[in-house]
């Protein structure tokens, strides 16, 4: 039985004051015990959030990490080693904004994935298609290629210690959302691709949906058999809204 997971990606939002307010709101939530809850604050606020959530069942992760596991001469980056020391347990790899805006390639993301696992960080691999790719009927081709990049480099068992988030690029921050059935179809294809390599890994890996998830649509999305929770963007910046999404996952 896969444990539901709800992860909040705060992206490049927050000041010291607003992060303190959000963290306090999260610490006061009554969260369902069966749901794995995580937040990914900007790197500058990771320590503040970890301190503010001390004693709470909320995991803190990083939005990005370096291509090498250890600290060293790599200006502007944060090493997995450093994130682990700070208290992080998870790291986002390949979010569409990193792929589309920063230009990170599958090769770069493979290195980040491996570096994170080498230091005990669990990667949350983000995959998904653009609107143009969906309209061209290439959704499964694109998602399959992004998944295959990791499988070919490290083997499918790399996903025994990873999470996968399907996030259609056209549904991120646009207000557009894949229908529950559209999302389920892609999630089923992802799980099927993994199962062709290793049925046990496929059955256990958590598959999250990301793309304008909010309290109003979370329950219907999370009710799909291959959707194990969500990677939440804007709605995670409101503690009450995020709490409602977590409760939807618990149901």
From Swiss-Prot:
Its EC number is 5.3.1.1. GO terms for cellular component: cytosol. It catalyses: D-glyceraldehyde 3-phosphate = dihydroxyacetone phosphate. The active site is at residues 95, 167. GO terms for biological process: gluconeogenesis; glyceraldehyde-3-phosphate biosynthetic process; glycerol catabolic process; glycolytic process. It is found in: Cytoplasm. Pathway: Carbohydrate biosynthesis; gluconeogenesis; Carbohydrate degradation; glycolysis; D-glyceraldehyde 3-phosphate from glycerone phosphate: step 1/1. Coiled coil: none annotated. Belongs to the triosephosphate isomerase family. Homodimer. Involved in the gluconeogenesis. Catalyzes stereospecifically the conversion of dihydroxyacetone phosphate (DHAP) to D-glyceraldehyde-3-phosphate (G3P). This is Triosephosphate isomerase.
